[in-house]
């Protein structure tokens, strides 16, 4: 009799296709080559964890074992994402008769980790795949990594710039790199002209367009005419005129736009590309910029975190790679053909869609205890509160201040916000109460810091698909929330994909101990989380494990295991001199009190290990 598979409880067929599955052992497994993964090549995540834990790492402080939490990286998945993106664009170019090519870049801000950036440059060599930088540190990383790239790979220099940034970008051109300085505002042109003359290096520049096309929701907040970056079309044409007067219009090669991360539908993808292509054509035809070669469509290629393919929220997109590529190629081709302008090279800065799938965060369960119910907040009383609040609509702007006015409108907006927040809190509490009344809710204490591992959850409400690593052939019987070990009430994950307020989990019983522990994976987490992580309570980054496929039979090899920062290293980032300010002071006081022999080994262990809990007893559920 076939064992049951409860993977679909977590919608793994939605968000996980084609990289994640549940194997015959009831374990989460990775399909390292996506749809090209052959039978027997799936990598068992549970086995990876236990092999990693058995690894001995030699450090200056002696041999150590890995600690939780940990990030598992699968570079084979990263390569497949890159190959799939290029296949999608190459297919769209070939099928439409587009008379140029696609040549993309990876925005370093998405994941600055050395292995990730270097892998992408290596994997993308045949595609002339390049990098995008938005700061001087990122530019230095790009310059070093692209030294090994195929000549001609783009080094797109975005972000606000000072003279040092511009000079560094010009030095990259002097090194033979294809660095393009993208102007965010007109004033940056003066810096480029000045530094070019000083260094004797002729630049290649681009301009960033502020499009009128917008996307809804959180990720569209920096787009449109009121957006933070770029210039409106008229200002771009002024820049072209300024270059023409200086006899430097040949410097201008690229037009860049970015309407926001996580574009939800292909209609918006198409409209943005068509609008930008119109500006590109005007620069070529009406403003004499005949040397233009490239349209950089920026980021926005989304990830379907909730697996619905609906595009109806910030967590979902209603398309795949092929539809995205086709929308851009078709829009630019038709616009350029209508204007009689040669088709430009198409570039995208697709970071989230490249990096998300290749990395997962592994969280260790420490204990599980029932969440106490507030006896006064029965679901009937909560529903009554919601109905009562709904009947008390905030005053209109007109009644606030006679005829209204700016102050009245602002006051009304503030009241609406407070009203909405209170309604949301009550509705959320009602949802949890109904769930708890039916089955009870358990708080699973996890060896993690929300602020260090999934900061986007805390910061913007970003949701990641989460599921147990093992026991997926057993029905999960507990409604759980995840509680971290920080001293902060925000350190809790109690919202999940598909509008769930709990995550189906298993009891922490003898079966959990038999599996060597109970682990929950946060998936599609390879973009932004490490870069945005903070040090709340001085918890640090995780252990990093690099895993590669080793052929059939589920074979894999652990290429490297890197421990996360030690307590000593984290304390040092807060400007403490660990020896003078910490070690020497503790030694002095402990010696004076005659307890140094006891304190010394404890202090040493505390400083030289990761700040998370270590050597924790097997987890249990309190019923």
Swiss-Prot record:
It catalyses: L-arginine + H(+) = agmatine + CO2. Expressed in stems (at protein level). GO terms for molecular function: arginine decarboxylase activity. Substrate binds at residues 295-305. Its cofactor is pyridoxal 5'-phosphate; Mg(2+). Pathway: Amine and polyamine biosynthesis; agmatine biosynthesis; agmatine from L-arginine: step 1/1. Belongs to the Orn/Lys/Arg decarboxylase class-II family. SpeA subfamily. The keyword Ribosomal protein does not apply. The modification N6-(pyridoxal phosphate)lysine is found at residue 109. This is Arginine decarboxylase 2. NCBIfam families: PRK05354.1, speA. Keywords: Decarboxylase, Lyase, Magnesium, Putrescine biosynthesis, Pyridoxal phosphate, Spermidine biosynthesis. GO terms for biological process: arginine catabolic process; putrescine biosynthetic process; spermidine biosynthetic process.
